[in-house]
A protein has these predicted regions:
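N-terminal Rossmann-fold NAD(P) dinucleotide-binding loop
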Residues: 24-25
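Conserved glycine-rich Rossmann-like NAD(P)H-binding loop of the short-chain dehydrogenase/reductase
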Residues: 36-51
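Flexible N-terminal pre-Rossmann segment of NAD(P)-dependent oxidoreductases
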Residues: 1-15
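Substrate-binding pocket helix/loop in short-chain dehydrogenase/reductase
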Residues: 103-111, 115-120
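Conserved glycine-rich cofactor-binding loop
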Residues: 13, 20-21, 44
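The beta1-alpha1 cofactor-binding region of Rossmann-like NAD(H)/NADP(H)-dependent oxidoreductases
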Residues: 45, 66-78, 116
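A glycine-rich helix->loop->beta "capping" turn
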Residues: 58-61, 81-94, 100, 115-118
Length: 129
């Protein structure tokens, strides 16, 4: 196998969580440029649709699904949507992350100042999301 074909992602369906964030949107654009079909998941539908439109304008294939990665039922629903449309998921890129909205983590806090449940939510978002 030639090296240039080893990492060919043409027509591969790649799902990106956190796809409306800074990292996710740039990775989505690059993967689409390389020929992948990009499924962008994120919380901001306006930004998500803008990214999809930019990718499509450049000749790429993309779709957006509004998603909060902390909502497992929504993730399962979106996976069914992706499978119905494309029949496959070839790769998953987890770019979701950050602090939990509403978490009580004051600036300058140490790990010992953070509520245990809030800390678990932040870990879930950044490690599992």
């Amino acid at each position: 196998m030639k090296m240039k074909n080893l990492f060919d992602i043409t027509k591969k369906v790649i799902v990106i969580t956190g796809g409306t964030g800074i990292l996710g949107r740039h990775v989505a654009a690059y993967l689409a440029e390389q020929g992948a079909v990009v499924v962008i998941m994120g919380r901001n539908s306006g930004i998500g649709e803008d990214i999809v439109n930019c990718i499509r304008t450049s000749g790429g294939r993309a779709m957006f699904l509004e998603t909060d990665v902390m909502n497992r039922k929504r993730l399962e629903h979106n996976l069914k949507t992706i499978m119905a449309k494309f029949g496959q998921v070839d790769a998953l890129l987890n770019a979701a992350g950050g602090n939990m909205p509403g978490a009580t983590i004051p600036p300058g806090s140490t790990i010992f100042d953070i509520d245990t449940e809030d800390f678990k939510k932040v870990l879930d978002l950044n490690l599992i999301g």
